[in-house]
Amino acid sequence: MKRIVTEISNGVVIARNGEKHYILDPGVVVFEGNEIIFVGTAYNGGADESIDATGRIVMPGLINSHLHVTDTPFTQGFLEDIGDKGPARSATNLVSLYSVLPEVRHATDPDAQIAAAECAFAELARTGSTTVVDLGYDFEIGGNGYIAITERVADVAGRMGLRCYSGPRYRSRHYGLKPDRGVFYEDYPDKGRSRFEACVEFCKQWNGRYEGRLRTMLVPGQVDTCDAGLLKETRRIADELHLPIQLHAGQSPNEFRRVGVTESLTTVEYLDKCGLLGPDLIIGHGQVMSSDGDMNSMSAFEVAALR
């Protein structure tokens, strides 16, 4: 079957020569099927289709590497209205992280979560994201975070044509805000092991679907909600199945203190002790986690941090 050749011309092209990006204004990009065959200023070959990109930017797709598509369309407004505001309160992240987010998530039913995912994925595609990473929830969200919901969300991304990394979360315990503004932690009955097994099975069954556009990843919830055994088992499975890992860490001063009290270690030291540090680990947030030597450890292990 003949592959269609498409020429995009007259736009501002953000190109790359292998070492750095550069601008072509105007520029031309030509692709055949799913392969780019020309980037430059003038194309002399024939094309089956032409797109006039006058007044537009032609660029590689954006990578959005930390998303919660099933709840952000709901939680964003609440965070803006009643979340932590101002430098002092936002630095603690107490109300937003430990009260608003869990409560709003728990109030959403599975069908609403799918509608939110459809809305979020459509907005991402419309604004230039072609690769997205969605981090799901466990019992914190309505519907108890059943894997069937994760499967439905992954199917939405696959049918939309996005490249998607899907990671349902698991953890040993959950947290919340007490009336005195202290943070409580409560262990799950089985320390989250059954949820972990379900997430691993999802990763095995769904990795590589939709012509390879859907990938899976291991997502232990937060550094302060996962015991050492769960993190060590995460590393073992990641190595066995060659899966990436993303973990929430450095979200609040409370989290940093919690790890210090329970483990007598800094956040990074705890992750190192559990064997989690490595080039396949992405730390989400990472605002409150550093101590002398911690950044050097992350650099040595080629750990990525994003927010």
Explain the meaning of each model-derived region.
Residues 61-72, 244-253:
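Histidine-centered catalytic micro-motifs
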Residues 141-295:
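Metal-coordinating catalytic core of metallo-dependent amide/deamination hydrolases
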Residues 1-45, 56-58, 63:
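N-terminal metal-binding scaffold of metallo-dependent hydrolase/deaminase domains
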Residues 48-53:
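Short, well-ordered secondary-structure micro-motifs within conserved domains or adaptor modules
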Residues 56-59, 67-82:
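N-terminal hydrophobic targeting/anchoring segments and the immediately downstream early-domain regions
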Residues 11, 29, 34, 55, ...:
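Divalent metal-coordination and catalytic microenvironments
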Residues 79-136, 140-163, 195-209:
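Alpha-helical scaffold segments that flank or form the walls of functional sites
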Residues 302-307:
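Short, intrinsically disordered, charge-balanced linker/junction segments flanking boundaries
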